[in-house]
């Protein structure tokens, strides 16, 4: 308790500085509402947290709410202390951005029933069933898939023969992941399947850093994949480590959470990201107008919650038109990311038993829920956070 009290006092001072730092910039309407944002890492160095902060500040400018921002809050007691201090300061909504924040946000929600506590990437909103705790994510697997299509087109342009075929040696990609969680596995599988739709014999090695943000580990991981012959690299880790390693090596890179073109002008291709501004505006609308907020909110291309960056000049010729056509197929339902006809698991065709998520997800799925129906896996339809956590053929985990 003494430790928690010390954290509360330090958090109070820093959070108050956050209020003064941003609310003076609001040029839109003025709302009598404070909203708190808790970030795992400093936004200056983490592409993941930078994406959240920019979206939050954009929503604050457009709606006029008073923003409280606290960075570098670890996945422990400090998160609960920060969330509760924000509630004490009068925040009507508190949002946290990292998977490991969830238990501490739930604890804060129990103590402050009149405050809305919203959490990105979490999985427990339905099972804990608190009236003031919510999860949110987006169908980023579709964005990852399109980024993979972009990667496949680059491999085909760079290494394809007269018929467009790419040798096995050149059809090899690498992927730097943070943790072997469903969020990461779903993302790299989507990316891989997008590339596979263009280069059928593509393979991919994956290595994990076991940290969301560690620039030197991510750089070392990318260098390891390059030494194994990867001709293109992507990542689900939050620093510039992997993109910078690709820039030095002159190997194409597909980034995440935002463009790295400024840092990596010779090798950046495209980036997919979740645009959180629509969600921030949605939760504010629900709060001030007493509307019901979804327990599991899923953003999409349609509502602006999923985005691709501009394609760099390093992309293959015709990439933008090709990818846009694939995007339309995803949106109209004529193509599905996890189509069972496009991958196997241990040499077998996918079945419900092979792909059903494990019990660690904490979600109480209704009796009879089928994840594999109509010829594809229904990602992010039964909860907001990704659930696909199976290693498919063609992807090798090297850790």
Regions found by a protein language model. Give the residues of each.
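Bacterial N-terminal signal peptides that target proteins for export
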Residues: 1-11
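Core hydrophobic alpha-helical transmembrane segments of single-pass membrane proteins
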Residues: 12-19
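C-terminal motif of bacterial Sec signal peptides marking the signal peptidase cleavage site
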Residues: 21-24
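A residue-level marker of the well-folded mature domains of exported/periplasmic proteins
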Residues: 29-399
